Design a protein with these regions (language model features):
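Conserved N-terminal glycine-rich FAD pyrophosphate-binding loop of Rossmann-like flavoproteins
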Residues: 37-59
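Glycine-rich FAD pyrophosphate-binding loop
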Residues: 24-44
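Beta1/beta-strand and adjacent pyrophosphate-binding region of the FAD-binding site
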Residues: 2-15
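FAD/FMN-dependent oxidoreductases across multiple families
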Residues: 68, 246-332, 338, 344
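A conserved beta-strand/loop capping segment in the N-terminal third of enzymes
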Residues: 53, 58-108
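C-terminal helical "tail/cap" subdomain of flavin- and related membrane-associated enzymes
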Residues: 334-427
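Conserved Rossmann-like nucleotide-cofactor binding loop
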Residues: 15, 38, 172
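Predominantly flavin-linked oxidoreductase catalytic cores and closely associated redox partners
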Residues: 113-270
Length: 427
């Protein structure tokens, strides 16, 4: 039976679109499937660190202000009675600015970028499962059904075939689950909720992070596990949310939407986060972290982005790593395409797992240790109270948490972080 493409990518989020883009750039025929019709909303903080900005630049994505992007110069941190502003570091490896753009338009930009590179995009196509070759046990395609905007069936089932399938289908990953790749319980798991507000400070140049969440008046009530964020979007609105992380797959037992409401009652008044200015409901999502589903590649099926649990335990960012994974996946697939034998092609595809483990495995292990420490609110309070006033400590913390440091060379802070990622066991 003939293949429909060299590679099928399931899911049009950042990881899937990046995979499709790079595969198309390498001259491969690509089929990108997504059940939604773009633009569509996704729960996210919408803020991008310099690491994500670098990945977008590598893809050739334009992020001009007139196209709805806003740049940020660093992180404003509030906690322990302190309020400090930490500029993004000047490094050779990364730009010295971050970005923000609502996911509704951000994902559409990336899908269209992949389409322009030559990927065939089928929207409104819900993948229902993998096609598995009976003799080899390899994934050789997917089954799917057309759906309307409400997810209702809109046509007959269809089958698509390709020698490689990439699962970029999110935290639940129907494809990964269907072949027995379940989530690991020993990896961190986060939870985040967010909404949007109109605000006069929509063009604020700093990503604001609140390291302490109180269940009432700050300093006079109980500390809760988690952190809050305010990311200005430059379009009259800001993304406002809070998150929490657990060192295992068992989420903390907190009503986050209720906590969000209480936090907003004591939010900085200058932001004008009032019920009248809120746009849409508070929505939540799980944040799979630290490679919580493995193997990243086996028997024709690759995992990228949330399907592989690639969110950083340090800061809850997943986009940068999804884009990076898409780049690495496409490189492995392109190399496999030109190999003369099945064994040689398989060796090339397996380099994806090794590459991602080398790039991020040590960092994610450090992140797990970090989460074990800060998941206790009392420890977080002590760290912020005594750590924030110390410039060298915060320089180290910013680079570690944002994963923005020189991977080789650099100053003493860069060398310490790079060294730590190499001496711990890779996730």
């Amino acid at each position: 039976m003939n293949d429909d493409a060299d590679v099928i990518v399931v899911g049009g989020g950042p990881a899937g679109s990046a995979t499709a883009y790079y595969c198309a750039q390498a001259g491969l025929s690509v089929l990108l499937l997504d059940k939604a019709t773009f633009p569509r909303d996704k729960i996210c903080g919408d803020g991008l660190t310099p690491r994500a900005t670098r990945e977008l630049a590598l893809m050739g994505v334009s992020f001009r202000e007139e196209d709805g992007w806003i740049r940020n110069k660093g992180l404003r941190v509030i906690g322990g009675g302190h309020r400090i502003e930490l500029p993004w570091p000047e490094l050779s490896a990364y730009p010295s600015f971050g970005l923000a753009k609502a996911r509704t338009s951000f994902d559409q930009v990336l899908v269209e970028h992949a389409r322009a590179a030559g990927a065939k995009v089928l929207e409104g196509t819900s993948v229902t499962g993998p096609v598995i070759d009976e003799r080899s046990g390899r994934v050789v395609g997917v089954t799917a059904k057309p759906v309307d905007a409400k997810g209702r069936r809109a046509g007959e089932d269809v089958t698509f075939r390709a020698p490689v399938v990439v699962a970029a289908d999110g935290v639940a990953s129907r494809l990964a689950t269907a072949v027995g790749r379940e989530k690991r319980d020993d990896r961190p798991m986060g939870v985040a909720v967010r909404t949007y507000f109109t605000t006069p400070r929509h063009d604020d140049a700093w990503m604001e992070s609140h390291l302490e969440l109180w269940d009432g008046e700050p300093g006079k009530s109980n500390l809760m596990p988690g952190y809050g964020w305010i990311f200005a979007l430059g379009d009259g609105t800001a993304n406002v949310g809070l998150g929490s992380v657990s060192s295992t797959a068992h989420a903390t037992k907190v009503d986050y939407k209720d906590l969000f409401e209480r936090w907003m009652k004591h939010a900085p008044p200058e932001w004008e986060f009032t019920p009248e200015n809120q746009i849409g409901p508070v929505r939540g999502a799980a944040l799979p972290m630290g490679f919580n589903r493995k193997p990243l590649y086996a028997r024709g099926l690759m995992l990228v982005g949330d399907a592989a649990g690639m969110v950083s335990p340090f800061n809850g960012e997943g986009i940068a790593y999804g884009l990076q994974a898409g780049r690495a996946a496409a490189q492995a697939i392109a190399q496999a395409k030109v190999r003369p034998s099945a064994q040689a092609r398989e060796r090339a595809l397996l380099t994806y797992s090794r590459q991602m483990r080398e790039d991020l495995g040590g960092y994610y292990t450090l992140g797990k240790y970090f989460v074990k420490l800060i998941e206790h609110p009392e420890v977080m309070h002590v760290c912020t109270k005594y750590g924030l006033p110390r410039p060298l400590v915060m320089k180290f913390t910013l680079r570690l948490l944002s994963d923005c440091y020189e991977p080789s060379g650099g100053d003493v802070v860069d060398r310490v972080i790079a060294g730590l990622t190499k001496i711990v066991p890779a996730a």
